[in-house]
Amino acid sequence: MTLVVKVGGAAGNRLGPVLDDLAPRRDYVVVHGGSEEVDRLGEKLGHPAEYYTSPSGVTSRKSTPAHLETVVLALAGKVQTTIVREFAARGVRAVGLSGVDGGLLLARRKEGARAVVDGKILRVTDDWSGSIERADPALLRTLLGAGFVPVVGPPAVTANAEIVNVDADRAAAAIAVALGATDLLLLTNVAGLLRDPADAASVVRSVARDEVDAILPYAAGRMRKKVVAAQEALRGGVGRVVIGPTLGPDPVARGLAGEGTVFR
């Protein structure tokens, strides 16, 4: 039974303990983000990240053509290569893939996205963000069957061969659904979904699938997308989703043991 593990790319995440924990295992897929590296490279190239908040409260990056180029350079370049190299140092044969490779992540370009600006709802223009429609597991199964560990990150591709930026948590959910994964771990730089973001001890421990909408108000900023990803994974047949920390030893084992916020 394939395990899908998404490793956060924001500041404060620790990659080493995750890879240490995964190295002895087999039959898993790693999905990565890389927001910290995207922001760093964007600043260096003179293309700082732009964000907007939708009327529903979800905060997203605006993927202008310049930003999309930065995403490709940062994620498919540095972040992914770093993960594959670190796996190699642990004796693991990993293969880096973007969602474009082999049509792995098929997406639809977002049209008519709206943003709240100074209390007004405005249309977002010049945005190359996408919504994932499905993941094709064929290439992943081929690699897994040959003993390789797939390491996957954005961007994705549309039916018209356009490259679009997609959310890595929701990409992980789509991959978990496509593979029929039993578990999806969304590992991040906090202990889980917090009732009070200022209180690290206020972790929501368990969420039933019919309770997700009710706890969404607690999910601020990027955490909201993780909760949405958890909901999408459950709806697609994944048995359990855990939002847990990368911090400390054995983060994968602890996540599988239920540390963090468990959705089922």
Task: Mark where each language-model region is.
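C-terminal catalytic "cap/lid" subdomain
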Residues: 1-264
